[in-house]
Amino acid sequence: MITIIWSLCLIFCLSNSILVIAKDLCLPDQRDALLEFKNEFSIPSPDSDLMLILQTTAKWRNNTDCCSWGGISCDPKTGVVVELDLGNSDLNGRLRSNSSLFRLQHLQSLDLSYNDLSCTLPDSSGNFKYLRVLNLLGCNLFGEIPTSLRSLSYLTDLDLSYNDDLTGEILDSMGNLKHLRVLSLTSCKFTGKIPSSLGNLTYLTDLDLSWNYFTGELPDSMGNLKSLRVLNLHRCNFFGKIPTSLGSLSNLTDLDISKNEFTSEGPDSMSSLNRLTDFQLMLLNLSSLTNVDLSSNQFKAMLPSNMSSLSKLEAFDISGNSFSGTIPSSLFMLPSLIKLDLGTNDFSGPLKIGNISSPSNLQELYIGENNINGPIPRSILKLVGLSALSLSFWDTGGIVDFSIFLQLKSLRSLDLSGINLNISSSHHLPSHMMHLILSSCNISQFPKFLENQTSLYHLDISANQIEGQVPEWLWRLPTLRYVNIAQNAFSGELTMLPNPIYSFIASDNKFSGEIPRAVCEIGTLVLSNNNFSGSIPPCFEISNKTLSILHLRNNSLSGVIPEESLHGYLRSLDVGSNRLSGQFPKSLINCSYLQFLNVEENRINDTFPSWLKSLPNLQLLVLRSNEFHGPIFSPGDSLSFSKLRFFDISENRFSGVLPSDYFVGWSVMSSFVDIIDNTPGFTVVGDDQESFHKSVVLTIKGLNMELVGSGFEIYKTIDVSGNRLEGDIPESIGILKELIVLNMSNNAFTGHIPPSLSNLSNLQSLDLSQNRLSGSIPGELGELTFLARMNFSYNMLEGPIPQGTQIQSQNSSSFAENPGLCGAPLQKKCGGEEEEDKEKEEKDKGLSWVAAAIGYVPGLFCGLAIGHILTSYKRDWFMRIFSCFSSPLKK
């Protein structure tokens, strides 16, 4: 009994000791380091109970056990902090290299994601020699990755994603992190090539390098990553062929290499059509794949006829390439396939789906915009689970009865654009149809069967022959949000009822009257190329806080652009070719997302809006043919158009001198940069929002060329023609190496043509005509191989026209009215050429006299000798002939 009592006492004492130890587990130096680290940042006071819960550090207090604090885990034996999880904890400040954080040297996991650290990654980060997990996602880091990270030899997870200003190249030494399993660097600004040392990370299972600015090809060493399951290289600027070594990644389940410039050998490079290409072999070897996205590249291969080895495939997207040949029927037999997107390729021939015996799991099928022909196979109706179907621009060779598609009862999205349809008003769509796209279907009447649709979300009936007015019942459809009726023959006044439409596109019709006030709540409004009159509705000023796209070009609108209608989310504004007047709206300075701005051919009277340079995303600015005046540069103006691709201020009354460094800082025109658009909130299902339905006129040598969609992005242009600019052409123009079109004609520029123009290696059109330029045409311009159009006429240039195929192929009118110019293609010879021609002529004359003399002397001797022979021997035949000529004389 005594023994039992003593045992119970011992257990009680030990348990109390353990509790005491547990209570005092936190080491003082660890607690102090944590509290000091917290005080290094500004943390807003929680304004609600929810914020109090979210702020992990809110209950950190001195004289309490730090191992019980939120976000903290300690080693149960030593009491050191081994895990610090402060993700999304409202930390605002700068993580310094001497931060108390680095005193927690036993950390194994550090998560500071979604805080504002506003710093370069300190070299001290390499001091965490036991660190296994480092998560700095979305921390506003900038600069380059420090080399000290190579010291984190135990690291298994590294996430530096969504740090928009994290730059430089991926370090070759990152290949030393041989225990790494997860590496995520998405949405940064990394450049350069992928180091081959990345192939040393043989334990890597997840690699995400998407949304960066890399260059070059993928290294063959990527094939060493045998454990890799997820590979995401979306939008990285890679090019070239995919290494065949990737075919050995047998564990790969998710592959996304979309939106790059990867290529593959096409059918023409195959010695035999029976031989599988390297690309086909690589694809078939990846038998564990479940998700494949190869879209928006430059692949030209044919798909293998038998793809049954990819039995686990659930999603297969190769859209936006140049795949050719027939679509293999084996694709439709894959048992797990849910999504198949083969759109926008060069597939041809009839579609053969094959005999589908078992129920198909296929839910999404996109095969539009190819070269498929022949009748639509009835076997497509066996895909009873289809919820989305796109067969756009299928050459059926005749009229297709719309009713056959109504048998697919699960359809929610249907795109039959470009197919000649027979539509009856008695048709009944499935009640859950959400997206219906019937563009270019030869429809002549508004589809009345839409009147009772209760789920329709997106309707596109553009590019048909529908006449009359838009039926009022359209605006009563309860779920309708996106409407495109452009390129029809709708007429009369546009009668719209108040509704929650997000996007309304009605350009290229015959609407007239005033723009109805009901449009004021719309986020995307495109009414270009109609006959609207009156003013821009003033309701925009007070109602619409979500307007993102406003296109009203080529109407008869008058008045001013409403000053208060332009809010922060505006992304594209085109009111060109109207009768608008007044001043340029200064409220545009609030539109930080603005990319496309066109007010051409109006009557706007104002000075140059230099404050537009503060808009960080502006890519196109067109002020052409207005009444703008004054200088386009002001002293002290240090800003530049960093992302501008198209700059047209022609046909105004701008004046003044441009400083020599005026074009410094025009980054996109200076170097090749593929702008990645991370602007949130503009995705629209089924509508090409990227193009904004943009249209801009480019003038080259008097000819107008309309750039539609993304054309302005390709033709990087500066047009300042038809103004009163004077002084020298800025020498800094030579920085803009990506410039395609440069027009500075019809101004008062003086001085010499800057030799730096020869640096514009991509220039295709150059117009400097009708200025007061003097001196010679720089000879280096003759070496610009793409310069197909040029005009130097009506200046005061002199000297020889440079040699070069492109220059010599120009019409002489391109150099006219420059009295001092000479040489081809002008008729006027240069001074040196005239002397050379004269010397050559004199030399030729001398040679001819010498030749005559050389011929005369032997001829004389020869003649005398022959005469002597003839007169001495007097042959009978000679005397008879001679006597015939001489006898008349004797008479």
Swiss-Prot record:
Ranges for the LRR repeats: 105-130, 132-152, 153-176, 177-201, 203-225, 226-249, 250-272, 286-309, 310-334, 336-358, 359-383, 384-407, 408-436, 438-453, 454-477, 478-504, 506-519, 520-544, 545-568, 570-591, 593-614, 615-641, 642-665, 712-736, 737-760, 761-784, 786-809
Extracellular topological domain: 23-849
This protein's name: Receptor-like protein 50
Main location (coarse class): membrane
Cytoplasmic topological intervals: 871-891
Membrane topology term: Single-pass type I membrane protein
GO cellular component, one term: plasma membrane
Domain of life: Eukaryota
Signal peptide (residue range): 1-22
Cited PROSITE patterns: LRR
Residues listed as glycosylation sites in the UniProt record: 62, 98, 200, 251, 285, 306, 355, 422, 442, 452, 531, 544, 554, 590, 605, 743, 759, 791, 811
Membrane-traversing stretches: 850-870
Record keywords, A-Z: Cell membrane, Glycoprotein, Leucine-rich repeat, Membrane, Receptor, Repeat, Signal, Transmembrane, Transmembrane helix
Pfam families on file: LRR_1, LRR_14, LRR_8, LRRNT_2
Places the protein is found: Cell membrane
Family, as annotated: Belongs to the RLP family.
